[in-house]
Swiss-Prot record:
The keyword DNA repair applies. This is DNA ligase. The active site is at 111 (n6-amp-lysine intermediate). GO terms for molecular function: DNA ligase (NAD+) activity; metal ion binding. CDD domains: BRCT_DNA_ligase_like (cd17748), LIGANc (cd00114). GO terms for cellular component: cytosol.
């Protein structure tokens, strides 16, 4: 391929990737692959400037506007950032800055992996919020942004200002959202960034409010009245904006690199995703002096973390059944080290995912961790796929191969039909109960609809006992599986008939654990009814929906007799949930189960929110480091019970930091700011 053809191919590919990323929010390649192609194109264009195309992505910032949203023309150009991937490349950028500026100073900020947006305020009131789009024209998403709780609708000062920032979905909210989507049979989002982008493009503002987006603001797009970037960020905090406290003042490359190394270590601790560090010249007058290229400011650069991937082989695919009947494929792989953990299994999501990527048994694949948490298959290495050796199926051929190779014929991949036997076999029957699987038109999932499917019953029991439902401590998946296999428990009502003697028949269950479980089961009878409702596992009814339903009807019995119209009147709940609830309680099985649970002494009443005026009432508290006695969620719940507002980052507004072992930058920053420090034991002593 000649140079001109290669430039054309790279340009077309990158423009398509940019469209998928910026406009559709459905990227088909990893950032690292895009960056590799982009830098190859830059190199080719530098060597052959006469061949640069007018639509080259090196001249613009990508994206077009979907017809479904009103276009918004930005009064200021919203530039993207240039990026570097090594200390050497960063040093070259810093050297260029020093050629223009004497003794420059820098501000280093975390690069949030979210969706860029701009907020327009007039006389202190939010009038417009828009996506960045292509840098000149974006989408008006004002009503959706108003549903983000940390975006101030009115500033502390009555000023006109345009600010830029990033909308993101915290990891905890992302996990909750995907869990809800899985229960509803919807495809999970690939990562928090895609989820944030998809949320801001929702036409139903109630969905936006429910998902819990957050923001960090980082730049004034309108002419700034401050002298430095550091002052801009402090001013933003005074106005009421959320500003990321994880930032550092630096005077040279070494200090910049120290922050990058700290950010790399901090990455897994953060409650949100980051994909790098942004370095900016601190002085705004010097920023103006340095100016811009066609695409990016010369006074700022983004250092991007390398995407960690690993190559492995898919050995086989298992199909498992969840409590709602969704049948999910999981790849068994040759164990490989990825992001400091050994990975041997990865989700394949659904049939569509397998077929779109053409995933087959014994394929070599690249895997990565979505959000650095969930192992996923990213790319099939087709060039390493071993083709099957097809032989004409004859008796003579069979006899020859068996005589010549014996059992090794299997190892050599010799097959005697046109069927490609490495393709993943899509099940037509449930792997647990052999019932026919259903593929509904509005779903991507295969589903077992047999209410007596053992796997579904087992998973429903596990869900019922889980922390967010009835919170029966000690009654985990292993114990429940044994109880189910021994037929000691066949539905959730049976749990309340268990005795210590029953539990002692199980493997690895001793007297102490058995007593603990029986006590926890008894205690769960007194839970507020929304916990019980969530534990029943009604499709589309998550924890928040369960609470809203019980707030309205006050009692589980009353809810079980409600109509779809009555339920649909509840704000934030729609017809889908109303239909699901009514349909569930109309079944004979549900009516019988309610009677059994009531006879077992379970509370059916909504007990209401517990308002605790504790010693930490109104205080902002940050947890950091490794806790040895409490789980992090337990510590958070205890702090909230004492009246505290638990935050994920240290700032001037922080009142207290609870520091466990190996506490890092948050503890250091708290000490620098003179914030009170507690140990885990101090918290336990309360």
């Amino acid at each position: 391929m000649n140079i001109e053809s290669k430039i054309k191919e790279f340009t077309d590919q990158l423009n398509q990737f940019a469209y998928e990323y910026y406009t559709l929010d459905e990227p088909s390649v990893e950032d690292s692959e895009y960056d590799r192609l982009y830098h190859e194109l830059v190199k080719l264009e530098q060597e052959n400037p006469q061949l640069v195309r007018a639509d080259s992505p090196t001249h613009w910032t990508g994206g077009v506007i979907l017809d479904g949203f009103v276009k918004f023309r930005h009064p200021y150009n919203l530039y993207s950032l240039g990026d570097v991937f090594s200390r050497e490349e960063l040093a070259l950028w810093e050297e260029r800055v020093r050629k223009e500026i004497v003794n420059p100073e820098y501000i280093c900020e975390l690069k949030i992996d979210g969706l860029s947006l701009s907020l327009y305020y007039e006389n202190g009131l939010l009038v417009t919020a828009a996506t960045r789009g292509d840098g000149t024209t974006g989408e008006n998403i004002t009503e959706n942004v108003k549903r983000i709780k940390d975006v101030p609708l009115k500033l502390k000062e009555a000023i006109d200002i345009v600010v830029r920032g990033e909308a993101y979905l915290p990891r905890q909210n992302f996990a909750k959202l995907n869990a809800e989507r899985e229960l509803a049979g919807a495809a999970p989002f690939a990562n928090p960034r895609n989820a944030a982008a998809g949320t801001l493009r929702q036409l139903d503002t109630k969905i936006v409010a429910k998902r819990g987006l957050a923001t960090f603001l980082y730049q004034e797009a309108s002419p700034a009245t401050n002298d430095t970037q550091e002052e801009v960020l402090e001013y933003f905090e005074e106005l009421g904006f959320q500003v990321n406290p994880e930032r550092k003042f630096a005077r040279n490359l070494d200090e910049i690199w120290e922050f990058i190394e700290e950010a790399t270590r901090l990455r897994d601790e953060l409650p949100y995703d980051i994909d790098g560090v942004v370095i900016k010249v601190n002085n705004l007058a010097e920023q103006e002096e340095l100016g811009f290229t066609v695409k990016a400011p010369r006074w700022a650069i983004a250092y991007k973390f390398p995407a960690e991937q690993a190559e492995t082989e898919i050995l086989s695919v298992d199909w498992t059944v969840g409590r709602t009947g969704v049948v999910t494929p999981t790849a068994n792989m040759t164990p490989v080290l990825l992001a400091q953990t050994t990975v041997a299994r990865a989700t394949l999501h659904n049939v569509d995912y397998i077929q779109e990527k053409d995933i087959r048994n014994h394929d070599k694949v690249m895997i990565y961790k979505a959000g650095d948490i969930i192992p996923k298959v990213g790319k099939v290495l087709l060039e390493k796929r071993k083709p099957a050796k097809h032989l004409r199926k004859t008796h003579r051929a069979n006899k020859y191969v068996w005589t010549r190779f014996g059992r090794r014929s299997v190892e050599k991949g010799l097959v005697f039909s046109k069927r490609e036997d490495n393709r993943v076999k899509i099940p037509t029957q449930c792997p647990e109960c052999d019932s026919d699987l259903i593929h509904f038109e509005d779903e991507v999932a295969l589903r077992c609809v047999n209410p007596l499917c053992p796997a579904q019953i087992r998973e429903k029991l596990i869900h019922f006992a889980s922390r967010d439902a009835m919170n029966i401590v000690g009654l985990g998946p292993s114990v429940i599986s044994q109880l189910f296999d021994k037929k000691l428990v066949t539905d959730v009502a049976d749990l309340y008939q268990l005795t210590v003697e029953d539990l002692l028949t199980l493997d690895k269950v001793k007297e102490t654990l058995a007593q603990k479980i029986v006590s926890a089961i008894a205690q769960s009878r007194e839970n507020s009814a929304e916990k019980l409702l969530f534990g029943l596992g009604i499709r589309h009814v998550g924890g928040k929906a369960a609470k809203l339903l019980l707030e309205r009807f006050a009692n589980l019995r009353a809810l079980s007799q409600a109509s779809e119209e009555e339920i649909s009147e509840i704000p934030s709940l729609g017809g889908v949930i109303a239909t699901a609830v009514v349909s569930y309680f109309e079944t004979a099985g549900a009516k019988t189960l309610l009677d059994e649970l009531e006879n077992a002494g379970l509370n059916f009443a909504y007990l209401g929110a517990v308002n605790v005026e504790g010693i930490l009432s109104g205080k902002t508290v940050v947890l950091t480091g490794k806790l040895t006695t409490l789980k992090r969620k337990e510590a958070k719940e205890k702090l909230e019970a004492l009246g505290a507002n638990v935050s994920g980052s240290v700032s001037k507004k922080t009142d207290l930091v609870v520091a466990g072992e190996e506490a890092g930058s948050k503890l250091t920053k708290a000490q620098d700011l003179g914030i009170e420090i507690w140990s885990e034991q101090d918290l336990l002593d309360l």
